[in-house]
Amino acid sequence: MKLLKNLGWFLLALLSFLFIYGFIQVLATTSLALGASPYAVTLLYVALAGVYVYVIYKWYQKAPVHIEKSGFNRFIWLPALVWFLSLVVQFFLPNDPSVNQQIATDLTLAQPLFSFFAVVIFAPLTEELIFRGMLARYLFPKQDNSKQTLLFLLVSSVLFALIHSPGTLQQFLVYASLGFSLGLAYISRKGLIYSISLHALNNLVSFLMILML
């Protein structure tokens, strides 16, 4: 019964991400497409998205997550290494951008100021809060052994990949590997700072590559 209740709460958090934060994004991008000032739209977006992040973060803080020491979180450098290796592997894969990546590319080229805040700042904040923080808080609050932690990492990685709308197996694996490294970052520090920072670094690299190439 408690598991079903917690599942319901997590789904509510997920729906808030999809519909409330999604509405904020659509409102901003539609306004830009209609010719509104990029500065005004970005300012409004930062304000609305900031309120959403604050509310979800306060919600996340209401209950602790217990994570025991294991092979998955023993080394603080492991998440960064996994992320770096997955990044290197992508350079040798065929160019196969997902719909989500293509949208991000087009948005970055058309509206770099807005895109910086959307992609580099708020995407890491919102996605880490939901797919690491709220997932752990409600469905994996007591990770007492390696099996529970591994299950959290796998579920987190799969959900993270699916939310980015992969159209091929390669796209799914790219997002899942990123999600796995971010999950490792979350459990290694038993909090969101590391995973948000690593996620922001990943998106910053992509953002700069789009602008420079």
Where are the regions that the model predicts?
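Membrane-associated alpha-helix detector
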Residues: 5-13, 97, 135-139
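Alpha-helical transmembrane segments in multi-pass membrane proteins
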Residues: 3-59
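Transmembrane helix-loop-helix hairpins at the membrane interface
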Residues: 112-213
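Hydrophobic, aromatic-rich alpha-helical transmembrane segments
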Residues: 2-7, 11, 35-42, 68-76, ...
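Juxtamembrane/transmembrane-helix interface segments of polytopic membrane transporters
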Residues: 20-25, 29, 90, 136, ...
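Alpha-helical transmembrane segments
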Residues: 5-21, 77-84, 153-158
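Juxtamembrane helix-loop-helix connectors linking adjacent transmembrane helices
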Residues: 32-38, 61-123, 141, 211
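Structural signal for the C-terminal ends of transmembrane alpha-helices
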Residues: 53-64, 185-188
